[in-house]
Amino acid sequence: MPKNNLLRTLPKVDESIAQLRSTGVAYSSDFVLKKSVQTCIARERQGILAGKITEKRAEDSWHACFLKELKERQAPNLRRMINGTGVVIHTNLGRSLLSSQVAERLAQTASYYSNLEFDLATGKRGSRYSLVEDTICELTGAEAALVVNNNAAAVFLALDALCRGTEVIVSRGQLVEIGGSFRIPDVMARSGADLVEVGATNRTHLYDYEDAISEQTSMLLRVHTSNFRIIGFTSEVPAEEMVGLARKKNLLTMEDLGSGSLIDLTSYGFPKEPTVQELVKAGVDVVTFSGDKLLGGPQAGIIVGSKSVVERIKKSPMNRAFRVDKFTLAALEVVLRSYYDSRQALQEIPTLRMLTTGKDVLLKRARRISRRLSAKLKEKCTLRIVPTMSRVGGGAFPEHDLASWAVAFRPEHIRLSEIEKRLRKLNTPIIGRLENEKFLLDVRTIQDDEVGLLCSLLLEFFLEAS
């Protein structure tokens, strides 16, 4: 059919909306209905003009197109997903999960007024930071604490408040870059501090710092290289030695710990990483770390240290630009209180629970999934339970893999790349990985309470796909 004739067959927007209404479409917004119809018609018009569409679309096909577009517009942009990648602190999938206790507190905080900045004892204005400061100090041993909206903000704010217009000395091997092109030298430049690099990429000694100290120096900075490792002929200055030098020269010390952990995980097979408490005990004046990585909480940047130094940071005009809201504080308080008992924290905090779950528990979970799917999918795909390796994620423990189990799918009538693509487009997307000619779902990051949903989605998908 000629293009002009095809274009004349395109439905009218108002008539299409009226038809949708007459068939009982339960959506009150004319704006969304109109946008859905216009999008479908515009897409059809483009196809006709490009020569890709040469036949008139059937009436019932238009109706289906409108409904599909409307459904997609109604779906939330930020949606639930099932993480079968095995990456526990997956930055692209939202980093740390929060527990049901946290979700309950967040719902209460959202639905009712709260004492965010109201002192219940005096009836006067209070400070939002006091809601979690005492708890952070009790857990870390610090004299004072401040919470901002992420660790990059924490680093910037500390440098801006303490070091603007002065020199900060840092090892060349610690000038890290993390996700989103966040580079320590760039942050220092924006904060107004002048960077002084010392040492070599692989080795830095105490005398390197001492030789670089001048009248303009205000701080010795350590940046924990949590997202990469330099191995072989290496050397770095321990926090205790740096603190000793700084005190002798009347300088401040600061550690950007990055992921930041309150629990030593070496008993669970992890390499030794410094905890926040250890750095505070070593006398570091300021320690910054993330809330949504190894801590297992909401996105936040936590600053701890000596009272006099943290108070200077609190008074910075930039503090207000980085302040956290009531939801972050509500979630963080619940997470922090779990740490009063480390065994409780390992069970209640999803991130820690996933990181420390044993292989036997993971194998049982994999078998549960396999039992539900194998018999019904035997003609559609081959299922196997295979050993695999999970990752911590979040820029933590870059060299440490976690032994795990995965359910591996090898389909009979559909390409692996097509499986990955189509599972990603489900209403509840399922994200896995392609490995050794199989589609793998690592069960470490699949929660027990979503096994049923996962199996239902997979059954529906494979039985329809052919």
From Swiss-Prot:
UniProt GO BP: conversion of seryl-tRNAsec to selenocys-tRNAsec; selenocysteine incorporation
Superkingdom, natural source: Bacteria
Reaction catalyzed: L-seryl-tRNA(Sec) + selenophosphate + H(+) = L-selenocysteinyl-tRNA(Sec) + phosphate
Entries under InterPro entries matching the protein: PyrdxlP-dep_Trfase, PyrdxlP-dep_Trfase_major, SelA-like, SelA_trans
GO molecular-function term, one example from the UniProt record: L-seryl-tRNA(Sec) selenium transferase activity
Chain positions with N6-(pyridoxal phosphate)lysine modification: 293
Record SUPFAM superfamilies: PLP-dependent transferases (SSF53383)
Keywords from the named record: Cytoplasm, Protein biosynthesis, Pyridoxal phosphate, Selenium, Transferase
Coiled-coil region: none
UniProt key word Cytoplasm: yes
Annotated localization: Cytoplasm
Pathway as given in its UniProt record: Aminoacyl-tRNA biosynthesis; selenocysteinyl-tRNA(Sec) biosynthesis; selenocysteinyl-tRNA(Sec) from L-seryl-tRNA(Sec) (bacterial route): step 1/1
Metal-binding is among the record's keywords: no
Disulphide-bridged cysteine pairs: none
Cofactor: pyridoxal 5'-phosphate
Pfam families for this protein: SelA
Listed EC numbers: 2.9.1.1
GO cellular component: cytoplasm
Principal localisation: cytoplasm
Described function: Converts seryl-tRNA(Sec) to selenocysteinyl-tRNA(Sec) required for selenoprotein biosynthesis.
Family label: Belongs to the SelA family.
Protein name: L-seryl-tRNA(Sec) selenium transferase
Source organism (scientific name): Desulfotalea psychrophila (strain LSv54 / DSM 12343)
Source species taxonomy: Bacteria, Pseudomonadati, Thermodesulfobacteriota, Desulfobulbia, Desulfobulbales
